[in-house]
């Protein structure tokens, strides 16, 4: 008779069941998903913080650099509201006219003399090309005569040179300069430099001069035939230059006085003349040189101005701050209580402060609404020479 035996049951099971494996995979997936979510959240937070920092950095740079030009606008080392005359042979170049050292332009108003630069990119002219001004955005023109403590030691009428008080003046052939005293200012291009002497002749630089600063008379109250800077009221008789050596001979109570005032008390300033280099700039919103990550071309805040290139004046453009979309400018007239748009200003010589409002965006799309971060920032700058 045949017998059968049942297989023995193992005391412990070996390996994993299918259910246990699926549970393990699910737990691992949950942990991995959580880690990825935390990483993604931190990454987005980092990108948002980085883009916000970039916006703040661009705003700081824009306001800092622009404020320097605004504060100095209209300044000269002599007297406020001086009549000035330019002898530049500039053919109407905007940087050769010092009559309106602060000038605003509305969104549809073109800046005179703005054109493409030598490389084919824009220099403030309205258009869609790189560096060209975005249509509908405002712009501003600023000029100042920056002093280096240079005074006139001698200026002989009938000559084309001015002797300075030092040979360490850092002026170069081609620089646009101003010579001024308490009555008159003259704008010219330096045609020659020899130690402590600078020339203002018709040659030696481009665009050059049409005459000499000895014949300035426009804007004065007596229209002298010749004008000698450094002499009282511009008057010189031979070697006699009143006010140059006698420090008691001072200017009158007003810049327009025809006669200097003798003051033995020393309470007034001696009649002296100064020389300063002129800096000019234009600020506007233009099409950026670089493209963003999504391939679009943004906008930037630009500064364009004349530079001395080996004796020839050329315009140079600088991209000051990227991702500046809009710029709104408002101007405060002397004695006024409200800021005015450029179209509401009747006399640019009366402007004492400028309010600048910039609209900036982030380089990347990091907003919760699927758009770029946007910030609007405002800054008010006072013109130093007109606030006193």
Which residues are covered by each model-predicted region?
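Short alpha-helix capping/helix-loop boundary micro-motifs
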Residues: 158-167, 341
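Aliphatic-rich helix starts adjacent to a transmembrane/signal segment
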Residues: 2-4, 12-67, 71-73, 387-388
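A generic structural motif
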Residues: 162-163, 195-207, 211-213
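Structured core elements
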Residues: 141, 178, 187-189, 199, ...
């Amino acid at each position: 008779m045949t017998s059968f035996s049942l297989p023995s049951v193992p005391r412990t099971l070996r390996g994993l069941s299918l259910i246990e494996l699926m549970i393990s995979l699910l737990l691992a997936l949950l942990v991995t998903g959580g880690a990825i979510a935390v990483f993604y959240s931190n990454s987005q937070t980092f990108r948002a913080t980085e883009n916000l920092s970039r916006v703040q950095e661009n705003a700081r740079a824009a306001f800092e650099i622009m404020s320097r030009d605004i504060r100095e606008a209209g300044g000269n080392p002599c007297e406020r509201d001086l009549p000035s005359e330019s002898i530049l042979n500039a053919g109407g170049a905007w940087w050769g006219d010092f009559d309106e050292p602060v000038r605003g332009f509305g969104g549809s108003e073109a800046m005179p003399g703005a054109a493409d630069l030598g490389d084919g990119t824009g220099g403030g002219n309205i258009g869609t090309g790189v560096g060209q001004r975005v249509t509908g955005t405002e712009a501003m023109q600023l000029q100042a005569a920056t002093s280096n403590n240079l005074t006139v030691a001698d200026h002989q009428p009938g000559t084309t040179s001015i002797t300075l008080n030092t040979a360490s003046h850092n002026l170069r052939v081609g620089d646009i300069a101003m010579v001024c005293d308490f009555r008159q200012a003259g704008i010219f291009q330096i045609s020659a430099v020899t130690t402590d002497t600078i020339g203002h002749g018709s040659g030696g630089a481009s665009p050059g001069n049409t005459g000499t600063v000895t014949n300035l008379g426009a804007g004065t109250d007596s229209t002298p035939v010749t004008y000698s800077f450094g002499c009282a009221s511009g008057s010189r008789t031979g070697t006699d230059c009143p006010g140059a050596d006698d420090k008691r001979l001072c200017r009158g109570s007003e810049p327009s006085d025809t006669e200097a005032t003798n003051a033995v008390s020393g309470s007034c300033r001696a009649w002296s003349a100064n020389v300063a280099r002129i800096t000019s700039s234009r600020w506007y919103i233009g099409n950026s040189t670089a493209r963003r990550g999504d391939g679009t071309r943004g906008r930037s805040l630009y500064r364009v101005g004349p530079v001395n290139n080996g004796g020839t004046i050329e315009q140079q453009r600088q991209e000051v701050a990227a991702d500046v979309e809009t710029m709104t400018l408002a101007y405060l007239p002397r004695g006024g209580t409200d800021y005015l748009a450029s179209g509401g200003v009747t006399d640019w010589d009366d402007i004492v402060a400028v309010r600048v409002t910039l609209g900036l965006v982030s380089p990347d799309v990091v907003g919760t609404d699927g758009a770029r971060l946007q910030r609007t920032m405002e800054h008010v700058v006072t013109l130093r020479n007109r606030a006193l």
